[in-house]
Amino acid sequence: MAPTPLPLEQMPGVGGGGGGYLPAAQEGGPRINTMSMSVLIDFIIQRTYHELTVLAELLPRKTDMERKVEIYNYAARTRHLFTRLNALVKWGNSVSKVDKSSQIMSFLDKQNMLFVETADMLARMSRETLVRARLPNFHIPAAVEVLTTGTYNRLPTCIRERIVPADAITPAEKRQTLLRLNQVIQHRLVTGKLLPQMREFRIRNGRVTFEVKHEFSVSLTVMGDNPTVPWRLLDIDVLVEDKETGDGKSLVHPLQVNYIHQLIQARLVENPNALSEVYNCLHYFCQSLQLEVLYTQTLRLNYERLDDNNITVEEYVPGVKLTVSYWRDLKSELGYRLTVQSDPSEIGRPLAVVHVPSLGAKESAEVADRAVRSEHLSMERLIVHTVYIRSVSRLSDLKLEFQAFLKDVDFNLQGTPAILTVPVLSPCLRAEQIHITIDTHTGMFRCHVPKHLDCPIMEEMQDCLNGDRSKLPALLSELRFWITHRRCDKTLQHLPATATETLPFLVQPDQEILQPGRHKIYVKLHRHPNIVLVVQLKEKTTMPNEMEYTFHLGFVAYQKDELDVIDDSAMQLVSIVAQPHSDIPKCYTKLMRLIEFDTFVATHGPGTEVDAEVSPHKRKSNGDLLAPPAKQQKTIFPAYFIPELAHVVAMCDEKIPFMNLAQTLSKHNIPHSGLQVEANATSLVLKILALPQPGKTTFATQQQQQQGAPAVAGENKPSGTSGLPKIDSHVWDDLMRRVLSISIRSQTNKNSQVRIWVVEFVFYSTPLQSSHPKEQGSRRTVYLTYEQANYDFSKTVEDLLNDWSKIVYLYTLVYDFAEQLLNKRLSLCDMLVVKSYSYMNLLLGYGPKKEVSCNIYWSVQSHGFRLTFVGGMSAVNGHSMMRDQLAQHLNQQHSITQIAQILHETYNPLSSIAKLPVLPFLGIPRPQVPVLSFCVLAQSPCLIRLTYQAVYCLELRFRANRLVSIRDGASSRFERNVVEEFTPIQGLKAFLSKYVDESAVYRGRASHEDDNPLSPMGMEDNFGGPSSVAGVSAGGSSPFLGTGMRGPQSPRDSGLRFPAPHTPPSSSNPHTPASPHPSAGAGGGSGPQGHGNFNLTSPPAPHMPHPSPSGLMPSSPLNPQPSPHMVHSPGPNTLYMQSHQDSPFTAMSPANNNWPGSPSMPRPSPRPGQSPDHKSTGGGAGVAGGTDRGGSRGTLNRPWAGAVPTLLTHEALETLCRPSPYPNKDINVPDMSPLERFLGCVYMRRQLHRNIQSEETLTALNSTEPGVVLFKVDGLQCQVVLNQMHMQTLHLKVSQLPPMPDKHPPPFQLSQDDLLVIEQYFDTRVAAPPYRPNSLHSICRLLNLPAQVLKDFVQIMRLDLKPELGGDQLKWTVQICLRMPPSAVPIVPSGNACVVMGRMKILFFLQITRIPYGAVIGVGKDWKDSPSLVLPIVYDIQTNVTQLAERTGQVISPTMTAASTLLRRFAEFNAQQNQCTLFPAITDLLTNLQLAAEMPQPPPNQSIGPPVGVGVGVGSSPNPMMPMQQLPQQVGPQGPVGPGGYPQMGPNPGGPQ
């Protein structure tokens, strides 16, 4: 490949050089004066910036016009320059073609010039150079040798020696040479003189290394085997270090090491003792360095941590010695100092330490070895160890001084720093010993007791140790007593006592022990303020470290001054009579008595352990086999615990209350055996021999009677003591025989840690056998507890006597009851079971399963027996409501047998009554006032009153043979007026007659009556209880209607329905009802005779003496009722009639009637009226129960008929009171008792009548039917009637009013289907539980609306009742709120009627609930998460506009805003003049209302949540007191046209599409 020629400008000698052949401007040559574009731009910018800088410097000196001219010129030049640059850049984009052509031309020019130059050079060589050229004589052999062999061996010697290095020796030769050198060095050391300090060396690799510990290490060698060859110094390593202040750096600089190396090497030449010279030089240098290090450390220690008072450098001679003094505060003649110096007599020895005063040779050498002759050269260690040695020496001397006056005491000297411990007591804790040490800085003695750092004696003892030591024995004795005092405090820390050293005596006692200055303490007992224990402290003569204790018991009294007189009661152990309160505190103490204890007797008694040793060879008896080991280990107490003191204090604290109690028992004339110790020394016991019979005068009563004060609370009996049970002598003797023992002990409550008295009664069996598993043995114990906190022991005894009275009085009843329990004729065992009898309480179980209980006990406060009742697992105890009446009966009769029979016979009816709800309800009379649904008022054990919502009252009397009489409690028993608090119940007699069982009533009469008819009071006795219990004949007359009293139908009234009697009024008058009164504890009932003395006038006279609150007669099944077809068209729609199976209007008849024109003819009721729980007998439907066997319509419908008692069986009462399903099965409401439903319907009917009278828009109409409310509204006639089948539901009958003859017919009327919807809505929403009168107000206001508006409301009612009629397009269900819900906008007060009309506007509330996606109305779908909304709707009748009611400033939720927007849009675009827009607007709202994606939290007055009702589309009531009403699932094909002419709404198969 041909070589590529270089460019011409890159060739040497061509181009711009001086030897080139091309002219500079010749075409084809290299282009000069060219530069790159980037350099050009840099130059332009640099020029512009430079001109701008110069301009900025020169302009301030010129005038304004000159500055403007210069700025303009600068801008013009710069603009022109950059314009040319811009043109150049644009041209450069197309210069590539020109460059290629120029490169080609340049290459051709270069080739041409290359040939020309080659020819010229060859010509010059031939003409000038080669003329004189000659070839040299080449060295052919050398060239051949180099080329063939690659080496050259003919190099001259002079060159070879100077340039070529010699060959290296082999490793074997090297090892042989070093081994030979080691032998030479070893021979030199053996034959030469070697110092003892240099005996440690090692020979390795041809060198010898000498090492002197803690000073230096040096290496030497020799350069030959000639003895005259001098040693050569190889290496020097100084081993002196400063590990405290050196900071890890070397103490010797390398230049110093080099200098020493040169110096020693110079001295090694021609020196016979070369090695000695090496040691002397290096040893002196290292010792000087060590002294310098110690001096530096001392200065730094003195500067940083210590001062001149602790250590001071007294003298420092470099390289010679260093003297440091310490403990400068001690007054020593020589002073304490140490000197570190070199040995002047022998240079080779290390540094020595000299102590002043001198120490022993062993201690001094130990100090030097620790601090100087070690790797860690430290002055601090040297001083510390010196101080430790000095401290041990001084403490040893002090120990000898202590041993001089403290014999047989174990002293201990140990520790670092050294501590001397001196025990002052025996035994003594280490923390209680005196710890003596020496201050390392000052050398002074320091002492303290670790357990008592605040000991005041330590300061004086420390001064004594550092000064005059003659006072040490006395100070030790004071310290011994002081620590003993502290031990006493520690011992009493967990005992109820406090130790003190002095008492505030106003006059110093004469006793020697109480004189000042004696070593003693006073122990105050917390529970006994008048007792002081004096503890005298003494040192044993033989052993001063041991203490002796002497105890004295002192009785003290408190006085405020010298004139204060102290009575004799202070001489007692504890003052029983409370001292009068004084304004001036009694702060001074006076000693009354002082008793000395024998310490041995006090600490050794029946309550202490006995140490006994038994011979190992002695055989144990049978009684000793189970005993603990004979040799018991002695209890070891802590040294700070004084067992003698604790034992004496505990003994006093335990026995003093017993002594006080024993004194109090003696004063109450109660015999006892005194304080004793129980077997095995378990506790103290005080046994009572006998207790007095209750009711007798006690000591406290006698004392108070003597002082003129009333008796104590436990004995202040009422004036009439006849109410107390009589204690027969044989009963008392039997109880005394059963009492085995009465013991009093003292214990501590585990929970409150309070001491209590425990009184144990031990009885022998009981006369009454119980079923309790713990009461089956023959030994029965009763435990009573009393507090010891109070110091009034008389009260404790009185409480004991009161509890004893509980046992005795209850025993008097139990003794008789036990005998009667064995009598099989009374059958008490079948009535009850005795669950427990503990002598204090009698627990009886009764009822069907004997699971309810009655507890009988004696109450001291009420001086009578009390009863408490407890229910069972599956039953409640209904006797709790008449607990006081039963207790009163027991206190009067004193017979448990009668109480048992009453409990047995009244259990079933009271259990039935207990099932009635007693919860308070809101919204009955007023929305904010709660009223009890039922309230039970007990009058006697067999008479109660039952009120309903504080309006109606029932009087129930329990009778024998499982019968109960019920009458209206609103009628007074004493006069013919009505009780003001209550209202008579209309139709009560007819309602109760449906539950009468005639056979049971006849059986009850057969057992108590003669052949003669009964009087009206025949079924009631004077006592008020069952005749079997009271034993009173049932044929007595009424005690309230005797001579001188007129009955309710007195002949003095003119115009009465009955003729005046010719004989005085008697109890056999059938028209003289007896009425109970709440204040009557007992009374009688009435029952009319069987004759028919009745006035058949219909309706009854308005002047009857028993008016009804509404003026209506009670209905009866025998009353002629209008047929349900009289207000229906011939072809009624059965869609809304099929769900009312119990309604009296469901039976259709083609007959017509002129209702409400004239009274109809009597005919049978559509359905027979029979009790829900028994079939109708052959006597006809609706036979009047109780005492009216005739069952005539007139008797049942009389206003006073409810006042006549009606006899019911227990089963019928249970049926009345037990919650049962609603008669209309289609209405889903909570179960409710028939009695509550009947009273609720009567109450609603009464409220409706009052509402008709108060509302101007409602017009009352006269009705010939009793118990029927008839009224009319605008175009409609309404009839509200009680269902006569069961009298538990109200029904509404609506019909169009016929047009007046002189008026035109109304332009718009409701269809028959609309009327059926109204009736059904009234039955399911208004007259259904819970019964609220405000719902009636709302429905009446809706009925009074114009027919066209009412029709739209009827459509909403239809959608409310049957949501499935809405079809698929509805997304919400709707409900009409009849009462104001609390969750709605507060426009109307909560609970009030929320349908408001005024100024041609209607305000009502709707609750809408979102239908879940995919849900089908009527199918069980979970609705709990469906949001619900209460909308306040306002409909304007004049403008025909439906809108949302909004309050100014009210914050509403986004959903409410969307609903308001929909209603406004509907009013704007869908308004029709000839059609009411209410229902279409609501339908549009239910169809198009959408929920926001993120529902915000609603305001407090507007809650959005799931509906209350779950499972159907009916929704829920917005008021929590009105439960949800449900309709049955009715899904099926409907007609093509819906009710009212609106298009038919198909079923809703799912949610919104």
Curated annotation (Swiss-Prot):
Reported function: Component of the Mediator complex, a coactivator involved in the regulated transcription of nearly all RNA polymerase II-dependent genes. Mediator functions as a bridge to convey information from gene-specific regulatory proteins to the basal RNA polymerase II transcription machinery. Mediator is recruited to promoters by direct interactions with regulatory proteins and serves as a scaffold for the assembly of a functional pre-initiation complex with RNA polymerase II and the general transcription factors. Required for activated transcription of the MtnA, MtnB and MtnD genes.
Motif (LXXLL motif 2): 472-476
Bias (Pro residues) ranges: 1099-1108, 1159-1169
Family: Belongs to the Mediator complex subunit 14 family.
GO CC term (a single one): core mediator complex
Domain of life: Eukaryota
GO biological process: regulation of transcription by RNA polymerase II; regulation of transcription initiation by RNA polymerase II
InterPro entries: Med14_C, Med14_N, Med14_RM2, Med14_RM6, Med14_RM8, Mediator_Med14, RM3_Med14, RM5_Med14
Renumbered ranges of motif LXXLL motif 1: 55-59
UniProt biased composition (Low complexity): 1024-1039, 1065-1080, 1515-1534
Location in or out of the cell: Nucleus
Subunit description: Component of the Mediator complex, which may include CDK8, MED4, MED6, MED11, MED14, MED17, MED18, MED20, MED21, MED22, MED27, MED28, MED30 and MED31.
Biased composition (Gly residues): 1081-1090, 1177-1193
Region called Disordered, residue ranges: 699-723, 1006-1199, 1513-1553
Lineage, opening ranks: Eukaryota, Metazoa, Ecdysozoa, Arthropoda, Hexapoda
Identification of the protein by name: Mediator of RNA polymerase II transcription subunit 14
Keyword line: Activator, Nucleus, Phosphoprotein, Repeat, Transcription, Transcription regulation
Record's compositionally biased regions (Polar residues): 1131-1155
Signal peptide: none
Organism: Drosophila melanogaster
Residues bearing PTM Phosphoserine: S615, S1015
One annotated GO molecular function: transcription coregulator activity
